[in-house]
Protein backbone atom coordinates (compact mmCIF):
# COMPACT_ATOMS: atom_id res chain seq x y z
CA UNK A 1 0.00 0.00 0.00
CA UNK A 2 1.33 3.44 -0.95
CA UNK A 3 1.16 5.82 2.00
CA UNK A 4 0.53 9.49 1.39
CA UNK A 5 0.01 12.42 3.72
CA UNK A 6 -3.66 12.93 4.55
CA UNK A 7 -3.04 16.65 5.00
CA UNK A 8 -0.80 17.75 2.12
CA UNK A 9 -0.95 14.67 -0.19
CA UNK A 10 2.83 14.21 -0.25
CA UNK A 11 3.70 10.57 -1.00
CA UNK A 12 7.31 10.66 0.18
CA UNK A 13 6.81 9.61 3.79
CA UNK A 14 9.28 8.06 6.20
CA UNK A 15 8.45 5.43 8.78
CA UNK A 16 8.79 6.40 12.42
CA UNK A 17 10.23 4.07 15.04
CA UNK A 18 7.62 3.34 17.67
CA UNK A 19 7.27 1.33 20.86
CA UNK A 20 3.85 -0.12 20.03
CA UNK A 21 2.51 -2.29 17.23
CA UNK A 22 1.13 0.54 15.11
CA UNK A 23 2.89 1.91 12.01
CA UNK A 24 3.57 5.66 12.00
CA UNK A 25 4.68 7.76 9.04
CA UNK A 26 6.21 11.25 9.00
CA UNK A 27 5.51 13.72 6.22
CA UNK A 28 8.64 15.88 5.71
CA UNK A 29 6.54 18.50 3.93
CA UNK A 30 4.06 19.40 6.69
CA UNK A 31 5.44 17.42 9.68
CA UNK A 32 2.21 15.54 10.21
CA UNK A 33 2.71 12.05 11.64
CA UNK A 34 -0.04 9.64 10.72
CA UNK A 35 -0.97 6.09 11.62
CA UNK A 36 -1.32 3.54 8.85
CA UNK A 37 -4.99 2.87 7.96
CA UNK A 38 -4.23 -0.79 8.68
CA UNK A 39 -4.09 0.19 12.34
CA UNK A 40 -7.37 2.15 12.50
CA UNK A 41 -9.98 0.90 14.94
CA UNK A 42 -13.61 0.50 13.88
CA UNK A 43 -16.26 3.19 14.36
CA UNK A 44 -17.91 0.95 16.95
CA UNK A 45 -14.68 0.60 18.94
CA UNK A 46 -14.05 4.34 18.68
CA UNK A 47 -17.53 5.24 19.94
CA UNK A 48 -17.27 2.76 22.83
CA UNK A 49 -13.96 4.30 23.82
CA UNK A 50 -15.48 7.80 23.89
CA UNK A 51 -18.31 6.58 26.10
CA UNK A 52 -15.78 5.72 28.82
CA UNK A 53 -14.71 9.38 29.10
CA UNK A 54 -15.91 11.38 32.11
CA UNK A 55 -17.37 14.28 30.15
CA UNK A 56 -19.83 16.66 31.76
CA UNK A 57 -19.94 19.94 33.61
CA UNK A 58 -20.01 18.06 36.93
CA UNK A 59 -16.46 16.79 36.38
CA UNK A 60 -14.10 19.53 37.60
CA UNK A 61 -11.06 17.99 35.92
CA UNK A 62 -12.80 18.01 32.54
CA UNK A 63 -14.02 21.59 33.04
CA UNK A 64 -10.52 22.74 33.99
CA UNK A 65 -9.16 21.00 30.91
CA UNK A 66 -11.63 22.72 28.56
CA UNK A 67 -10.81 26.07 30.16
CA UNK A 68 -7.25 25.71 28.84
CA UNK A 69 -8.81 26.42 25.42
CA UNK A 70 -11.61 28.74 26.52
CA UNK A 71 -9.65 31.26 28.58
CA UNK A 72 -7.21 32.44 25.87
CA UNK A 73 -10.07 32.56 23.34
CA UNK A 74 -12.32 34.89 25.32
CA UNK A 75 -10.36 37.98 24.25
CA UNK A 76 -11.28 37.27 20.61
CA UNK A 77 -15.01 36.60 21.13
CA UNK A 78 -17.96 39.00 21.19
CA UNK A 79 -21.38 38.43 22.75
CA UNK A 80 -23.27 38.63 19.43
CA UNK A 81 -21.21 35.82 17.86
CA UNK A 82 -22.57 32.36 17.06
CA UNK A 83 -20.23 29.47 17.81
CA UNK A 84 -19.94 25.73 17.32
CA UNK A 85 -18.34 23.02 19.42
CA UNK A 86 -17.12 20.68 16.68
CA UNK A 87 -16.71 17.25 18.28
CA UNK A 88 -18.49 17.95 21.56
CA UNK A 89 -18.57 14.34 22.73
CA UNK A 90 -21.39 12.40 24.37
CA UNK A 91 -22.08 15.08 27.00
CA UNK A 92 -21.72 18.60 25.56
CA UNK A 93 -19.92 20.73 28.10
CA UNK A 94 -17.91 23.45 26.39
CA UNK A 95 -21.07 25.12 25.06
CA UNK A 96 -22.45 25.25 28.62
CA UNK A 97 -19.23 26.83 29.89
CA UNK A 98 -19.37 29.44 27.11
CA UNK A 99 -23.01 30.15 27.97
CA UNK A 100 -21.83 31.09 31.45
CA UNK A 101 -19.73 33.78 29.74
CA UNK A 102 -22.73 34.94 27.68
CA UNK A 103 -21.85 33.24 24.37
CA UNK A 104 -24.17 31.21 22.16
CA UNK A 105 -22.54 27.98 20.99
CA UNK A 106 -24.15 25.06 19.17
CA UNK A 107 -23.01 21.44 19.49
CA UNK A 108 -21.99 18.84 16.92
CA UNK A 109 -20.48 15.40 17.14
CA UNK A 110 -20.43 12.77 14.37
CA UNK A 111 -21.16 10.04 16.93
CA UNK A 112 -23.45 11.72 19.44
CA UNK A 113 -25.01 15.06 18.41
CA UNK A 114 -26.67 15.73 15.07
CA UNK A 115 -26.33 19.14 13.45
CA UNK A 116 -26.88 19.72 9.72
CA UNK A 117 -24.14 22.40 9.74
CA UNK A 118 -25.91 24.48 7.11
CA UNK A 119 -24.86 27.89 8.39
CA UNK A 120 -21.76 29.97 8.95
CA UNK A 121 -20.28 30.41 12.41
CA UNK A 122 -18.28 33.23 13.97
CA UNK A 123 -16.17 30.87 16.04
CA UNK A 124 -15.54 27.14 16.28
CA UNK A 125 -13.95 25.19 19.11
CA UNK A 126 -12.47 21.79 18.33
CA UNK A 127 -10.95 20.40 21.51
CA UNK A 128 -9.24 17.00 21.48
CA UNK A 129 -10.67 16.25 18.03
CA UNK A 130 -7.97 16.94 15.41
CA UNK A 131 -5.99 13.87 16.46
CA UNK A 132 -8.97 11.67 15.55
CA UNK A 133 -9.29 12.90 11.95
CA UNK A 134 -8.95 9.97 9.53
CA UNK A 135 -8.68 12.54 6.75
CA UNK A 136 -7.45 15.86 8.21
CA UNK A 137 -7.41 17.58 4.80
CA UNK A 138 -11.14 16.91 4.40
CA UNK A 139 -12.09 17.75 7.98
CA UNK A 140 -10.03 20.95 8.23
CA UNK A 141 -11.46 22.12 4.91
CA UNK A 142 -14.93 21.51 6.36
CA UNK A 143 -14.13 23.58 9.43
CA UNK A 144 -12.72 26.46 7.40
CA UNK A 145 -15.80 26.46 5.17
CA UNK A 146 -18.07 26.62 8.22
CA UNK A 147 -16.37 29.79 9.47
CA UNK A 148 -17.34 33.26 8.29
CA UNK A 149 -14.63 35.65 7.17
CA UNK A 150 -12.64 36.88 10.19
CA UNK A 151 -14.07 33.96 12.16
CA UNK A 152 -12.07 32.19 14.86
CA UNK A 153 -11.07 28.52 15.09
CA UNK A 154 -9.81 27.30 18.46
CA UNK A 155 -7.94 23.99 18.30
CA UNK A 156 -6.74 21.89 21.21
CA UNK A 157 -4.54 18.91 20.37
CA UNK A 158 -1.29 17.81 21.99
CA UNK A 159 1.64 18.35 19.60
CA UNK A 160 4.75 16.30 19.09
CA UNK A 161 8.14 18.04 19.14
CA UNK A 162 10.59 15.12 19.26
CA UNK A 163 10.35 12.07 17.00
CA UNK A 164 11.50 9.93 19.93
CA UNK A 165 8.16 10.53 21.62
CA UNK A 166 6.75 7.73 19.46
CA UNK A 167 9.39 5.34 20.75
CA UNK A 168 8.49 6.09 24.36
CA UNK A 169 5.37 5.97 26.49
CA UNK A 170 3.93 9.26 25.21
CA UNK A 171 0.28 8.94 26.24
CA UNK A 172 -1.04 10.66 23.13
CA UNK A 173 0.42 8.06 20.78
CA UNK A 174 -0.62 5.19 23.04
CA UNK A 175 -4.31 6.11 22.64
CA UNK A 176 -5.44 3.86 19.78
CA UNK A 177 -8.18 6.30 18.73
CA UNK A 178 -5.51 8.94 17.94
CA UNK A 179 -4.42 8.58 14.32
CA UNK A 180 -2.72 11.88 13.37
CA UNK A 181 -0.25 13.99 15.30
CA UNK A 182 0.61 17.62 14.65
CA UNK A 183 3.81 19.62 15.02
CA UNK A 184 4.25 23.39 15.32
CA UNK A 185 5.27 23.33 11.64
CA UNK A 186 2.08 21.47 10.77
CA UNK A 187 0.04 24.41 11.98
CA UNK A 188 2.26 26.76 9.98
CA UNK A 189 1.37 24.67 6.93
CA UNK A 190 -2.34 24.74 7.83
CA UNK A 191 -2.27 28.54 8.13
CA UNK A 192 -0.59 28.92 4.73
CA UNK A 193 -2.78 26.34 3.02
CA UNK A 194 -6.13 27.60 4.30
CA UNK A 195 -5.40 31.34 4.51
CA UNK A 196 -5.55 31.46 8.29
CA UNK A 197 -3.77 33.81 10.67
CA UNK A 198 -2.27 32.55 13.92
CA UNK A 199 -3.65 34.70 16.73
CA UNK A 200 -2.46 32.61 19.66
CA UNK A 201 -0.15 29.65 20.15
CA UNK A 202 0.87 28.14 23.46
CA UNK A 203 3.46 26.00 21.56
CA UNK A 204 2.07 22.88 23.16
CA UNK A 205 -1.65 22.25 22.91
CA UNK A 206 -3.81 25.26 21.93
CA UNK A 207 -3.81 27.39 18.80
CA UNK A 208 -6.31 30.09 17.83
CA UNK A 209 -6.65 30.82 14.12
CA UNK A 210 -8.52 33.55 12.24
CA UNK A 211 -9.90 33.13 8.75
CA UNK A 212 -8.72 35.89 6.42
Across the structure, where does each feature detected by a protein language model lie?
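Core SAM-dependent methyltransferase catalytic element
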Residues: 194-212
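Short, glycine-/aromatic-enriched active-site segment of Class I SAM-dependent methyltransferases
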Residues: 157-180, 185-186, 190
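Residues lining the SAM
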Residues: 127-130, 156
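Short glycine-centered segments of the SAM/dcSAM-binding site in methyltransferase folds
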Residues: 82, 150-152
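Residue-level signal for the nucleotide or nucleotide-sugar donor/cofactor binding architecture
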Residues: 131-135, 182
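Conserved N-terminal segment of class I S-adenosyl-L-methionine
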Residues: 1-123, 127, 138-140, 174-175, ...
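A short glycine-rich, Lys/Arg-flanked "PGG" loop and its adjoining helix->strand segment in the class I
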Residues: 140-149
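Short conserved AdoMet
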Residues: 78, 134, 148
Amino acid sequence: MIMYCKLCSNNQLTQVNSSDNRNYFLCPNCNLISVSPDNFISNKEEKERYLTHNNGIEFKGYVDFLNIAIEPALQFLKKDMLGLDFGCGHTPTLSKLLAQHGFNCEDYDPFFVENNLNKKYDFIFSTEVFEHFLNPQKEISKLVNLIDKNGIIVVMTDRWNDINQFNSNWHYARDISHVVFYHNKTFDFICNEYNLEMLYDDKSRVVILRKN
